[in-house]
Amino acid sequence: MAASSDSVTRKARRPWIAAFLSILATGLGHVYVGRPRRGLLGLLALWLAGALWVVLSMHVHSPGFRVTSFFVLIGVWCAVVADAVRLARRDSPDFVLRPYNRGWVYAALFLLAAFVLQPLYTRVMTTAVGRAVLFPGDMMRPTIVAGDYLLVSPHPRTSPMRGELVVWRDSEGTDFIQRVAAVAGDTAEMRSKVLYVDGLPVEEPYVAHIDSAGDPADPRMAWQEEHLVRSVADYRPSRDNWGPIVIPRDGFLVLGDNRDNSFDGRYRGLVRSGSLVGRPVWIYFSRHPGSGEIRWDRIGRSVR
């Protein structure tokens, strides 16, 4: 380190440090090279690009577009990092240290970004734009399988329709993805695995039936008795035969697509509209939970 005649301190900027700081927190590398405003613009550009990507991916139902635009987003981030590296190379070795070119300032800015700014951005994104969810089970097979990572949009204020996929949250804070089978005012029942709504059979091409075993009565379905269309002296509902029940106001009946192996509304009871937290849109990543193999054919696929 050397002092010039005008008492300014000069110190070379190292490109690898600029890159490292930029990877730690977008824009931090620019602070290191004396361009904090440029770093802030880079951070805002990346946040805006991320939000735009999420919004577009939910409205453009093309796997190719979703994957390609994601790599464009990665390119934006790489461009911000590369810009900090370029500035470090250009200004070295005659860089004049600023008052903020100190280790504790970098540490403070990193903590601010990691524990304040990024969580705030994530909260805004999950509330207004969308969030990522890992689906761990097979209740929705074949539509959604274990190991699928989904992008979920906040649920619209309008009530969900029959056949729509929804994310709902139970009293313990656990999220589930299931399909709306009946809405308020509907009369729903099941006869020999076939769902009927208002007396008419429902076309369900997404449903899988894989179990041909017996169909014993299930005591977990006793909640249905208070919603029966008419009183039944010895009501013995089972997985494949139950109802008819009337869906009350502000209630929804949700079922899993893996109909023979799904712990859904038949057993849990009805879901209230206040429990709906989102709508799954598409699979952004998929990995087999056992082998760890990436399922490339599922990435970018819409779920309906």
Short names for language-model regions:
Residues A19-V31:
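N-terminal signal-anchor/start-transfer transmembrane helix
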